[in-house]
């Protein structure tokens, strides 16, 4: 089997293990044209509900990504493990602290699947912002500086602009993209229409769609957001 080139993904569907979804919906998501499925959440994430989600996806060949909020849920039966480091927080445990324990406690076969993400969290009302005490009120220039730091200094393969449920500022995303040379830019937050998807896809290499899946008519909304 050829290696999976995650850098070429244009659209990723994010599924929250704490939210209900049917096997029929899973099949429709896989068939939608999305490039990969990311299993990710902040609240009430357990080994059990992560395992249930992975089991529902097991029969499909679509690339599977686990984005853990805690190291206890990490599993090896996925293609990649995208590990966030929160850049816009004063609390180092969310940037390197928990990650040190992860590296210390997991074998190479797991660590080899890790793709580090430089996270810039921008929705102050989101669970991830509250938990990490992210400094969300930053300007496009400051966000771009964080992104350039991730790219030039720390060589992160991914910068992730996270608006988490609300639609963000395209000018901020554009400013970030202009500072990246080698790093892939992910954008997630509030994409629930073709127009919003196309706007953010002009600047982000990859857009991530999550909450739209769980709204009324969610699968059809998801299909509207597929860009290539």
From Swiss-Prot:
Chief localisation class: cytoplasm
Protein family according to the UniProt entry: Belongs to the GGGP/HepGP synthase family. Group I subfamily.
Record protein name field: Geranylgeranylglyceryl phosphate synthase
Entry's Gene Ontology molecular function annotations: magnesium ion binding; phosphoglycerol geranylgeranyltransferase activity
One Pfam short name: PcrB
Amino acids binding sn-glycerol 1-phosphate: 14, 160-165, 190, 210-211
GO cellular component, one term: cytoplasm
Binding site for Mg(2+): 16, 42
EC number: 2.5.1.41
Keywords: Cytoplasm, Lipid biosynthesis, Lipid metabolism, Magnesium, Metal-binding, Phospholipid biosynthesis, Phospholipid metabolism, Transferase
Function: Prenyltransferase that catalyzes the transfer of the geranylgeranyl moiety of geranylgeranyl diphosphate (GGPP) to the C3 hydroxyl of sn-glycerol-1-phosphate (G1P). This reaction is the first ether-bond-formation step in the biosynthesis of archaeal membrane lipids.
Domain of life: Archaea
Organism: Methanocella arvoryzae (strain DSM 22066 / NBRC 105507 / MRE50)
Location in the cell: Cytoplasm
NCBIfam families to which the protein is assigned, alphabetical: GGGP-family, GGGPS_Afulg, PRK04169.1-3
Nucleotidyltransferase keyword on record: no
The reaction(s) this protein catalyses: sn-glycerol 1-phosphate + (2E,6E,10E)-geranylgeranyl diphosphate = sn-3-O-(geranylgeranyl)glycerol 1-phosphate + diphosphate
InterPro entries attached to this UniProt entry: GGGP/HepGP_synthase_I, GGGP/HepGP_synthase_sf, GGGP_HepGP_synthase, GGGP_synthase_archaea
A GO biological process held by the record: glycerophospholipid biosynthetic process
Cofactor dependence: Mg(2+)
Pathway listed: Membrane lipid metabolism; glycerophospholipid metabolism
